[in-house]
Amino acid sequence: MADQGVIVITVGGGGIPVVRKNGRLEGVQAVIDKDLASALTAIQIGADEFYILTDVPKIYINFRKPNEQALDTITVEEAKRYLAEGHFTEGSMAPKVRAALMFVEHTGKPCIITEAGRLGDESCGTRIVR
C-alpha cells in the first residue's frame, strides 16, 4: 500500500473493551493499549516494517539528563536491557518499546519509532532490530 502512496494508520485508541457473556457483549474494566494493538495488527497483516509515531524524533536513554543519548539503532536485547534499567517511562515510551519488541520478535522485521512529522526522514527515528 505504501508503494501506492497509502499509509495505513489503525488502532488510534478510544475502543471499549467487551466480553461475550450469555450471547451478549458486556463492557469490562480494561485498557486497550494502542501500541500493542497496533503491533498485533502489523504482525497479522504481515507488515514489512512497523512505525510507531510519537512526539520526539528518536528514543533516548537518560532522557532529560545531562548524559541523555539518542538511539539510532538498537537490538532487541539492548531494548530489553534499557526497559529493565528503567530508561523508558510507563505511559510514555515504555509501551512503545514493548510494542516494537513484540513486532520484531514475532516477525524478524524492523520497527521504527519516530516523530510523526518526520516520517520518511531516514536520519530520524530509532530502529529496533533483531
Which sequence ranges carry the predicted segments?
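C-terminal catalytic "cap/lid" subdomain
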Residues: M1-R130
